[in-house]
């Protein structure tokens, strides 16, 4: 497994320590965001660190293509889809791995994140329980050498993966070299664990924490399962900025298990399962989310997940409030061996209302009706979705 040795022979990586007191619980509304316009003073320390490092990597030419001022338009209609022209991604992105099962095991012979260049790493993030001190966020010189190990250590903690011990709270932040939007990164646990693309509680918890670390209402996090257009079978989340409001942030929902904030998104083209949290119960929310995704994996049901600032669905009305976050899970038809024939692939972004379009012709002609038709073709049949909803409610109510 020589490839593993080539990756990061004692690479030095910046460490970003964060604390619970860094979480931004009073979220910025989109109205307030628009008032700031180009003024970035509202950004949190996390936003500033991530954006500056990402732009630095872009200026160094580490991406497959430059991403500047993505051509964007809002489609007329009730959903207000955000369509963006991204021709270079469809041309230059890495060929996706062959996927045939949601439960597919990690294959070290396929491309995986043990093979990335050390320069692609932004920093590693560690949640600290220590007392917050001035300038304690970034610490230079943490060594990440376990990623260069000669074998996968799935199921065990790798020795030396971080000099300061890469515990479950240590997450690597890596640029997506084929970016969808500004600040597009991948969040992953220690790659030498060689975990397949099946969501874990620790990574889900980190994904929600990262949204609370950001003061930008447009910072999003997401997950594509195998069969849900995940292109690499190596555990990771996506994180990126989309500086446009999405309907999914405030769309109406129907309570399924109100006692655990589990809802069904309604009045939206892609019905999905919704969890809401104000940030006070992140660990238990991560457990419930993974109870759903584990159920889907066991049934070999492909799925996508989207994390965003959003309003509390319990209020029963549309609100500008963005103090909490919504986590939406879509069960869908699998894309095993599917050919990419539509204007866009239906994955986490598209289901949420963000459409990276592959070519100029489709970008010009695309309409809300055509988008909804493509999305509906990827969803479960109504009777199958109804039965799944009943099964999940029963499953979640089990102790």
Swiss-Prot record:
Primary localization: cytoplasm
UniProt KW Nucleotide-binding keyword: yes
Origin: domain of life: Eukaryota
Keywords: Cytoplasm, Guanine-nucleotide releasing factor, Hydrolase, Nucleotide-binding, Nucleotidyltransferase, Transferase
The protein's Enzyme Commission number: 2.7.7.78
Entry keyword Transferase: yes
Function field: Specific and highly efficient GDP-D-glucose phosphorylase regulating the levels of GDP-D-glucose in cells.
Protein name: GDP-D-glucose phosphorylase 1
Organism this protein belongs to: Xenopus tropicalis (Western clawed frog)
Lineage: Eukaryota, Metazoa, Chordata, Craniata, Vertebrata
């Amino acid at each position: 497994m020589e490839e593993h040795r080539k990756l990061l022979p004692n690479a030095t990586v910046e460490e970003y320590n964060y604390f619970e007191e860094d979480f931004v619980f009073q979220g910025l509304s989109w109205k307030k965001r628009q008032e700031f316009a180009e003024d970035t003073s509202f950004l949190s320390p996390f936003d500033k660190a991530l954006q500056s490092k990402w732009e630095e990597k872009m200026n160094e030419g580490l991406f497959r293509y430059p991403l500047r001022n993505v051509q964007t338009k809002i489609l007329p209609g009730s959903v207000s889809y955000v369509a963006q022209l991204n021709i270079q991604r469809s041309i230059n992105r890495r060929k996706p791995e062959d996927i045939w099962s949601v439960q597919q095991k990690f294959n070290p012979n396929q491309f995986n994140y043990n093979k990335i260049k050390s320069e692609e790493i932004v920093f590693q993030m560690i949640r600290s329980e220590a007392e917050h001190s001035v300038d304690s966020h970034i610490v230079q010189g943490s060594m990440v050498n376990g990623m260069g190990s000669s074998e996968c250590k799935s199921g065990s903690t790798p020795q030396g993966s971080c000099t300061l011990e890469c515990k479950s709270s240590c997450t690597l932040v890596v640029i997506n070299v084929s970016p969808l939007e500004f600040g597009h990164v991948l969040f992953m646990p220690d790659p030498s664990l060689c975990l397949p693309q099946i969501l874990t509680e620790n990574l889900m918890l980190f994904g929600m924490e990262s949204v609370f670390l950001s003061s930008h209402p447009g910072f999003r996090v997401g997950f594509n399962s195998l069969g849900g257009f995940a292109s690499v079978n190596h555990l990771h989340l996506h994180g990126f900025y989309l500086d446009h409001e999405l309907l999914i942030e405030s769309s109406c929902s129907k309570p399924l298990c109100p006692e655990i904030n589990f809802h069904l998104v309604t009045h939206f083209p892609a019905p999905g399962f919704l969890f809401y949290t104000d940030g006070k119960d992140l660990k238990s929310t991560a457990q419930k989310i993974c109870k759903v995704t584990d159920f889907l994996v066991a049934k070999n049901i492909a799925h996508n997940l989207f994390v965003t600032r959003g309003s509390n669905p319990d209020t029963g009305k549309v609100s500008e409030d963005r103090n909490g976050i919504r986590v939406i899970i879509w069960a869908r038809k699998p894309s095993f061996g599917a050919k990419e024939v539509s204007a866009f692939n239906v994955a986490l972004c598209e289901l949420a209302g963000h459409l990276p379009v592959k070519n100029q012709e489709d970008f010009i002609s695309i309409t809300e009706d055509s988008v909804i038709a493509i999305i509906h073709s990827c969803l479960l049949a109504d009777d199958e979705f109804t039965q799944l909803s009943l099964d999940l409610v029963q499953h979640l109510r089990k102790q």
